[in-house]
Amino acid sequence: MDQDKYLPELVAEKESLDASFVHAMRLLAEEIEKFEGDELRKDGEVKKYLDIISNKNIKLSERVLIPVQQYPKFNFVGKLLGPRGNSMKRLQEETGAKMSILGKGSMRDKGKEEELRKSGEAKYAHLSNDLHVLIEVFAPPGEAYSRMSHALEEIKKFLVPDYNDEIRQEQLRELSYLNGSDDPSRGRSARGRGLRLTSTASPRGRGSAAPPAPPGRGAAAPRGTVSSRTSVPTPARGVSAPRTRGTAGTPGYRAPSLQATHKTYEDYGYDDGYDGEYDDQSYESYDDNYSNQSKSVSEYYEYGHGNNDENYNNYEEDWISSRPNLKAPASRLTRGGYRDHPYGRY
C-alpha cells in the first residue's frame, strides 16, 4: 500500500459518503487522524494515548547500540558485565530497569552462537542483529520515563572505550578481591607496627626525650612515654607545642633536631613492657590517634606509665631538688588605690 496515495483516497471517500453512514464516517475519520498526526510507527504498531490519571504501569523498551564497529578491539561486553556479572546486576538495581546484551557477539562461544542463529528459533532471532543493549522498564508513566532516562545515562558511561577509567579500575579491584589476593590482615600488620619510626636517641631512662611520632601533619606522640624535662620536642606542623608545668625555656639554647630513621623500637632494647603494649595495640587505635589533629601532643602523655610508686617518688624528689635553680614566678601586682578589705574595720 502506497502511503502517499492512501491518505488522499481516505479524504475523498469521506467526502463522497452520505451523512447517514455514521459508522463508516467515524471509521474514516479515525483512520485519517492516524495519518495526519503521524502516529504510525515503522513496525506498523499504532501509538496509543498516554493515560497518566489512572497511573497504570506501562512498558518502555529501548535498544542501545554498542559501538563495536568503531572500536572492534575493545571488550564492551566484559566491561558491561563486570566480574561475575556484578556490574550489570548493580546497574539494574540502581536504575530499576531490566538490561540484556543481545545481538551478534553477545555469546562467549562463537560456534554455539552461529548454531543457534541458524536454528531459526524466535528467541534467537536477535543474534542476526547488531550488538546492542536492550533496556526494558515496566512502571507508571512518570516513573517509567525517569528510570529509562537514568538507565541511558548510566549505560553511556560503560560504552566509553577507556581501559583506565574509574569503572575499569573498580572492576579490577573487585576481581582481585574475589580471587583472594587482597588479604586484609596484611594491610593491618603493615600499618600497625611496620611503619613506626624512631630517632638515634640514647637508651631509655628517667627524664629522656620521648621518641618522635611518625611523620605527618597532626601526628600525636606515642602512648606510654615519659616527657622530657630538659627540652621540648619540636611539634609537627599543625599541632600546638606541648608545655610542661613549672619549666621555662633556656635563652640561647636550641634543641637538636631529631632525624628519623627506619629502625624499629626493638633495635634499641626496650623492655618487654613497652613491646607488649605496642603488640596489643590494634590497628584501629592507631587510626584514632593519627586522625585526631585537633588535639595537642601533651594530651597523649601518660606520666609514670609502667613504673611503680617508688620510681615515681624518686622522680618527684629529683624534680623538686632541681626547682631552686629556676626563677620563682612573679606575684601578681595589686593596685595601691584599693583597700585591703571591702568593709571598714570595727
Swiss-Prot record:
Keyword terms, alphabetized: mRNA processing, Nucleus, RNA-binding, Transcription, Transcription regulation
Compartments annotated for it: namely: Nucleus
InterPro entries given for it?
BBP-like (IPR045071), KH_1_KHDC4/BBP-like (IPR055256), KH_dom (IPR004087), KH_dom_type_1_sf (IPR036612), Qua1_dom (IPR032571), Sam68-YY (IPR032335)
Which biological process terms from the Gene Ontology are attached to this UniProt entry?
Answer: mRNA processing; regulation of alternative mRNA splicing, via spliceosome
- Please list the residue ranges that the record marks as compositionally biased, kind Low complexity: 195-224
Q: Which family does it belong to?
A: Belongs to the KHDRBS family.
- Entry protein name: KH domain-containing, RNA-binding, signal transduction-associated protein 2
The protein's organism comes out as: Danio rerio (Zebrafish)
The gene coding this protein: khdrbs2
